[in-house]
């Protein structure tokens, strides 16, 4: 994802309003080894990294986007380290105890990275739906879905466990104009746009005077757990 000041502001508002990242962290936590050093790969602005910290010794948050990492650095807590660069080249001195790939990367790529950088479990969080939610028209998510991930793991003979769950990640807005900017920012359709009336029809009453409008979004997700020892060298 290409981050901008506006997209970061939208996400921080949504994260503050919902327990989305906390919910994901709570699903991962029971499967983490004790005193673990984990990597949040493709961390973005690090909201999940911060939510994971109570369940482990240290979190290394990695993303290639400089603005995203600068945003995380401005809100760091003890036990979280932010690193800016390509996951492929930013290998740790010692292998991570676990790695989290939340809505990040092709499954084939994550398996390759994890095999080189992790000695324990990897957690792949994928969208459990097939089309982009904020676009005009029907825009496919392509290979970044649960079905695609399952196909890759099965084809390579890699055992895994899977857990489906939902987490509310709606977007609060300070104005209708902000909602229009949001849909313009996240519309992936090349030929269609939503009208003001269509946007307004998707909104509900917001939670406060500061945020009078709200876009509900109960996000269907799937958590795949894979042991790196089960990833054969020939599969990567």
Predicted regions and their residues:
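Conserved alpha-helix/loop element of class I SAM-dependent methyltransferases that forms part
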Residues: 18-35
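Conserved class I S-adenosyl-L-methionine
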Residues: 35-44
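Class I SAM-dependent methyltransferase SAM/SAH-binding core
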Residues: 45-86
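Short alpha-helix
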Residues: 143-157, 161-163
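Conserved Class I S-adenosyl-L-methionine
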Residues: 164-236
């Amino acid at each position: 994802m290409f981050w901008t000041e506006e997209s970061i502001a939208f996400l921080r508002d949504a994260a503050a309003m919902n327990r989305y990242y906390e919910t994901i962290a709570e699903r991962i936590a029971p499967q983490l080894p004790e005193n673990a050093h984990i990597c949040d790969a493709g961390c973005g602005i690090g909201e999940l990294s911060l939510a994971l910290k109570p369940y482990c010794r240290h979190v290394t948050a990695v993303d290639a986007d400089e603005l995203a990492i600068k945003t995380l650095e401005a809100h760091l807590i003890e036990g979280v380290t932010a690193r800016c660069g390509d996951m492929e080249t930013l290998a740790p001195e010692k292998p991570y105890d676990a790695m989290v790939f939340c809505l990040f990367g092709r499954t084939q790529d994550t398996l390759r990275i994890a095999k080189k950088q992790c000695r324990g479990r990897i957690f792949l969080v994928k969208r459990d739906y097939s089309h982009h939610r904020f676009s005009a028209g029907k825009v496919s998510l392509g290979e970044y879905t649960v079905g695609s991930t399952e196909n890759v793991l099965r084809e390579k003979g890699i055992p895994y466990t899977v857990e489906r769950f939902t987490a509310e990640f709606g977007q609060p807005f300070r104005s209708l104009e902000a909602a229009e900017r949001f849909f313009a920012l996240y519309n992936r359709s090349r030929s269609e746009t939503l009208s003001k009336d269509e946007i307004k029809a998707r909104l509900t009453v917001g939670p406060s005077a500061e945020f009078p409008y709200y876009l509900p979004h109960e996000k269907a997700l799937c958590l795949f757990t894979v042991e790196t020892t089960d990833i054969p060298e020939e599969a990567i």
